[in-house]
């Protein structure tokens, strides 16, 4: 029996939707909940799933058609009904009887765990990374030929126009062949690597040994040297530093060491877990070797760039203290002593000495003049003595690739004027992908179109003004630092500042219902909402989205933290549902993520307010205790509140902000952490 697929209700007050793209065609077989098409409204862009399993018999609305909610857009039936495209109209009235058998048929057992690869190599294909995504660009291989991988262990990083993600291994085994290089753009379904067992690795490994003549001596002795960009540590220990983990992040807290002194590690094998106020992440080993010293303990907060460990070989473990005494002298033997490297690699340096470029034939330590390079490319450049400032990248957006470094090392790209001073443009917060936008005119996406329309409209129909309060976050910062490890262990989510802001704002909205309100100019009525449905602004590659935490007044801080992470993740991966973007009564936007101290956020009616949270910065402040003034270093933040004067008066806005300020400065959140 055929089933009519109707345009669903995609949010409050939404009466129609525009079909932007059909993901299936007539004759295609679909499963229950498999995406059929993409629909756009003035509130959301979303995929419409199939309500039943079967074959698409007829499509009744074309792309770019605007269809009323409840309008029939397609007919789905059985395969033997395909020729009878005229029949579905009579069969549509009885969907209830169809749904039971239809939903029972397609149910499939969960896919069994991927088996280990056998001697016959298993193909690793470029996966489908989203609807309408047909290709992906390999940004970095995390493994090399000869490496052993487990099921679901990350193999490589891939970038598309919708998402950057890691691709896991479908099987356990040994990588016997890599068929696509970094920066290659590969079609979905194309084979990018092969995984087999150790025996299967023997033959392909020899085939891959030929591309770069310089790498042959390295690959002949240990098979671990498949990734020449990251050399193994030698007898002289290599410093492991606290990396820069985001813009404006100056320090990180070590939450857990995953390795101990004496442990052997491979390149990119996780060493420790680090937490900042923006991210929790694992820090990989920059070299292969043995951990000879750990210089920072768990729960220590360490500045970016500080040495936290040292890695050498087994011999280096015996006397790490002696190696520390002369780090400058160690660096020379590291490059000259390794037996794995033939003298052949020192010759290019001598030749370079006869050219103007030789004066700068070392890697720029800061890399500020370089558009963008991966850590592996930077290590390769250091190994071959190539100054990245003199290399012209051939990758996307001028990105320097491995091939560019090798070409420069071979003297293929060494112009006489390379040593000339280069303008030190900043690369902080620069997305090299955006370089291709220069000099072009492009149609905006749906999110940008809606944002442009709604923000201009909001300024025309509401009386917006902004009030700014300053809040001392020192006590919250101390409470957060003290409880972060226990919070992560118990609740499985990082404790950032945002849940504290959300908790304080939600409580203030309950206490000040005149701010959690909406004004109807036509009926001259004010609605005071019973629930606090808090919109959270999320920066996504496609643009700004504001998903909603419904009934936020009923949530604890752990529940708020989990809701924020969930909504942000689904926003960036195009997984939001229509209800996630509707019903908001107030908005919070984190304007401080890139260091902004303040802003004037734009509210979108029917909401009456939006609160910005600026960057939390340490600065000297006059404080008064027991009637005595003193100057102290405090962690301060600005909270700009934009509100609609049709709904809220200035004095009421001030009282609302004062309530938030008092809650945050008092910082009595211990009971709210549920530890």
Curated annotation (Swiss-Prot):
Binds 3 lipoyl cofactors covalently. Residues 2-77, 121-196, 237-312 form the Lipoyl-binding domain. Residues 77-124, 200-240, 316-368 are annotated as: Disordered. It comes from the Bacteria. GO terms for cellular component: cytoplasm. Coiled coil: none annotated. Keywords: Acyltransferase, Lipoyl, Repeat, Transferase. Residues 372-409 form the Peripheral subunit-binding (PSBD) domain. Changing residue 278 to Q: Strong reduction in the catalytic efficiency of ODH and slight reduction in that of PDH. InterPro entries: 2-oxoA_DH_lipoyl-BS, 2-oxoacid_DH_actylTfrase, 2-oxoacid_DH_E2_comp, 2-oxoglutarate_DH_E2, Biotin_lipoyl, CAT-like_dom_sf, E3-bd_dom_sf, PSBD. GO terms for molecular function: dihydrolipoyllysine-residue acetyltransferase activity; lipoic acid binding. The keyword Plastid does not apply. It catalyses: N(6)-[(R)-dihydrolipoyl]-L-lysyl-[protein] + acetyl-CoA = N(6)-[(R)-S(8)-acetyldihydrolipoyl]-L-lysyl-[protein] + CoA. Disruption phenotype: Cells lacking this gene display no ODH and no PDH activities. Belongs to the 2-oxoacid dehydrogenase family. Is the only lipoylated protein in C.glutamicum. This is Dihydrolipoyllysine-residue acetyltransferase component of pyruvate dehydrogenase complex. The gene is aceF.
